[in-house]
Amino acid sequence: MLGIPEQEDRSDWYKFMEPLLRDEESKSMFKMPAQYMFKDIPETGSHDDFIQYTIEQMDKFHINQAMIGFHEKSDVKIQAAKNHSDRFFFDLPVNPNIENEAENIKRHYETFGIKAVSAFPSGMYPQIAINDPKWHPIYEMCVELDLPFFCCVGVPGPRIPMAPQKVELVDEVCWYFPELKFVMRHGAEPWTALACKLMLKYPNLYYSTSAFSPKHYPQDIINFANTRGINKIMYAGYFPMGLSLDKIFAEMDSVPFKDEVWPKFLGENAQKLLKL
């Protein structure tokens, strides 16, 4: 997970969440809604070419490819897809509150070649729980197109209700849609032990480490990767939303993964899942 900034002020990235924010810090003081957790929001500065700037940041840390949230109204995303398909591939953020969202997935798949679908159940307004039937057309389309579904689970960072993202809700989705490739993102805390138990239970359930610096990777996830979950856990960053690549990779070597876990964690698991 990575973003291509389009300007130094990225507050517009979070406008979709404004109807849910009630405290004054979140509404008017934070650069991003979970800033109380992220003390050093990356400063990207101003650049004539933010795509090239992002590629340079990737090259510093030998990142060959990155998954970007796609928006067809963004000229930067369109140009990245057109001119740098070797470096960027795309997920489509979706919202069941939008009419015909499942067909929108198909259109983006056919037109832009998206590789995945993503969602933030607690962040949409109205909120929609992971197991709500309103998601079913989207899940069905993901199965039809064989697109992985990346979903925020666990307590959300922003000060908004957590109920739609309780990890226990994933159980029903994986039971009802056994062919759906479901990837938990943004922590699954405090239910990481349950997340691991569900990954043992369901062959198409995975976990990515998005929005967490390596020193805060949950111990349950590290233990699972080192044992029965070697093919289930995959790296994801959070640049430039909340973490710099410098911070992420300065801490990475301290993660106690076994030697055989590293290549799968850093690339092989994602490459297989996303058919890269």
How would you name each of these model-derived features?
Residues 1-4, 150-152:
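Histidine-centered catalytic micro-motifs
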Residues 3-60, 65, 229-234, 242-276:
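Mid-to-C-terminal alpha-helical segments outside catalytic/metal-binding sites
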Residues 3-5, 73-76, 97-100, 124-125, ...:
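Active-site environment of divalent metal-dependent phosphoester hydrolases
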Residues 50-57, 73, 104, 134, ...:
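Alpha-helical packing segments of well-folded alpha/beta enzyme cores
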Residues 56-64, 84, 144-145, 176-180:
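A structural motif corresponding to the C-terminal end of an alpha-helix
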Residues 58, 108, 142, 186, ...:
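Conserved, mostly hydrophobic/aromatic
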Residues 64-65, 71-157, 161-164:
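Active-site gating/metal-coordination segments in enzymes
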Residues 115-116, 128-234:
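Catalytic pocket-lining loop regions of alpha/beta-barrel enzymes
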